[in-house]
């Protein structure tokens, strides 16, 4: 999808990016970040298409301290991407270039875009589709953890889809190496996907810190969001949302969960454990019964005659199932008036109509609002939450500080 071009999206001049221009021909804009633009580009020699992330690191926009910070973070991201290169579910760094004013990172072109956009279009995914996506994501996370890398910013926006709807994990800007037994204290990530221990660590100087378990919490939030179409933790006041996260307060109360299996609810519950020591690891999550259906079974050793008979019976059974699925049970007026939302076809009709009328702003209950999933606010630097809470901010009262800490 091509995006509108603004003055800040102008291409670097030839002198500032000579090496990049000699090899690639930049095309239309396909995405934007906080301090970067992503363009489709074409390899001049082969004609192959890629995506290039262009970051301006000039003194005109950033202070010297910020410049060094951005360059160091980008180099760290490049180092990690090269270390994990070759995994089928992690984005591949093809090329990189650096000049005095710009940095260029060339990646595989993921034509289907972000999982977030796909979810926006579909509203909620089936268990079958979710199973495939989450299995691939957990395999990527397990690979990172085996290599002592923690991602720290897992969310649908950082999961890309290729032409075959296979996922690739991207955006390793917050990733870092973490040796066994080592702990982190830095507050980073996206609020709705932050693990409780990250928040507690920022509010309590005596907290021991957090580890790789934060990635599994984020996987639990993503799994819940894919199936429900809305996040597990949301409140219009962010301070209360953070308390919900720290206490692990979420519910399977929206109508979507009526059609979900207890198996997937069990997996979500084991990923969204407030105690990181009780939370599943990526390897353990992949062994959960929810993923049993993904495992390939041994092929039957059948004769040609037996294969033909199986094919005939399969076709006949499929025809009978298709025929019976079109025979809807009669809907009485009393049933429709009594509880229309309890009837799955009617519920889907209501949801589709509401979604077409109001877009993403569809209320899902007193404590759930689909708006939380689709809000786009400019990211701000993360201060220490304790400082925010104990300051004189007019947006947060002393009562709310007590509420969060109680």
UniProtKB/Swiss-Prot annotation:
Residues 24-291 form the Protein kinase domain. The active site is at 153 (proton acceptor). ATP binds at residues 30-38, 53. CDD domains: STKc_PhKG2 (cd14181). Keywords: ATP-binding, Calmodulin-binding, Carbohydrate metabolism, Glycogen metabolism, Kinase, Nucleotide-binding, Serine/threonine-protein kinase, Transferase. It comes from the Eukaryota. InterPro entries: Kinase-like_dom_sf (IPR011009), Phosph_kin_gamma (IPR002291), Prot_kinase_dom (IPR000719), Protein_kinase_ATP_BS (IPR017441), Ser/Thr_kinase_AS (IPR008271). Pfam families: Pkinase. One of its GO terms (molecular function) is enzyme binding. The keyword Kinase applies. GO terms for cellular component: cytoplasm; cytosol; phosphorylase kinase complex. Disulfide bonds: none annotated. Signal peptide: none annotated. GO terms for biological process: glycogen catabolic process; glycogen metabolic process; positive regulation of glycogen catabolic process; signal transduction. Residues 306-330 are annotated as: Calmodulin-binding (domain-N). Residues 346-370 are annotated as: Calmodulin-binding (domain-C). The keyword Coiled coil does not apply. Catalytic subunit of the phosphorylase b kinase (PHK), which mediates the neural and hormonal regulation of glycogen breakdown (glycogenolysis) by phosphorylating and thereby activating glycogen phosphorylase. May regulate glycogeneolysis in the testis. In vitro, phosphorylates PYGM. Belongs to the protein kinase superfamily. CAMK Ser/Thr protein kinase family. Hexadecamer of 4 heterotetramers, each composed of alpha, beta, gamma, and delta subunits. Alpha (PHKA1 or PHKA2) and beta (PHKB) are regulatory subunits, gamma (PHKG1 or PHKG2) is the catalytic subunit, and delta is calmodulin. PANTHER family: SERINE/THREONINE-PROTEIN KINASE. This is Phosphorylase b kinase gamma catalytic chain, liver/testis isoform. It comes from Rattus norvegicus (Rat). The lineage of its organism: Eukaryota, Metazoa, Chordata, Craniata, Vertebrata.
């Amino acid at each position: 999808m091509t995006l509108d071009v603004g003055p800040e999206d102008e291409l670097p001049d030839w002198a500032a990016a000579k090496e990049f221009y000699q090899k690639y021909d930049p095309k239309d804009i396909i995405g934007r970040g906080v301090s970067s633009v992503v363009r489709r580009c074409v390899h001049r020699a082969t004609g192959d298409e890629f995506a290039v992330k262009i970051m301006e690191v000039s003194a005109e926009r950033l202070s010297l301290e910020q410049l060094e910070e951005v360059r160091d973070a980008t180099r760290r991201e490049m180092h990690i991407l090269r270390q994990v290169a070759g995994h089928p579910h992690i984005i591949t760094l093809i090329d990189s270039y650096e000049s005095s004013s710009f940095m260029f990172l060339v990646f595989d072109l993921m034509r289907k875009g972000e999982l977030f956009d796909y979810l926006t279009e579909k509203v909620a995914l089936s268990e079958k589709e979710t199973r495939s996506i989450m299995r691939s994501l957990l395999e990527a996370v397990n690979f990172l953890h085996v290599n002592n890398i923690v991602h720290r910013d897992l969310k649908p926006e950082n999961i890309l889809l290729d032409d075959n709807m296979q996922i690739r994990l991207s955006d390793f800007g917050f990733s870092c190496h973490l040796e066994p037994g080592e702990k982190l204290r830095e507050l980073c990530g996206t609020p709705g996907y932050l693990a409780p221990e990250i928040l507690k660590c920022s509010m309590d100087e005596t907290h021991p810190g957090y580890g790789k378990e934060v990635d599994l919490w984020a996987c639990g939030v993503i799994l819940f969001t894919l199936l429900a179409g809305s996040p597990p933790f949301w409140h219009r006041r962010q301070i209360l949302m953070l308390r919900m996260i720290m206490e692990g307060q979420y519910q399977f109360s929206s109508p979507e969960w009526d059609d979900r299996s207890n198996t997937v609810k069990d997996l979500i519950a084991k990923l969204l454990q407030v105690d990181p020591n009780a939370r599943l690891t990526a390897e353990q999550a992949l062994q959960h019964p929810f993923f049993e259906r993904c495992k390939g079974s041994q092929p039957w050793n059948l004769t040609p005659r037996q294969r033909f008979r199986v094919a005939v019976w399969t076709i006949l059974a499929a025809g009978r199932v298709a025929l019976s699925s079109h025979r809807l049970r009669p809907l009485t007026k009393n049933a429709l008036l009594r509880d229309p939302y309890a009837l799955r076809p009617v519920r889907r009709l209501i949801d589709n109509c509401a979604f077409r009328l109001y877009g993403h702003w569809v209320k899902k209950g007193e404590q759930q609002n689909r708006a939380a999933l689709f809000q786009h606010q400019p990211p701000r630097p993360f201060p220490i939450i304790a400082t925010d809470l104990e300051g004189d901010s007019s947006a947060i009262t002393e009562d709310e500080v007590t509420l969060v800490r109680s």
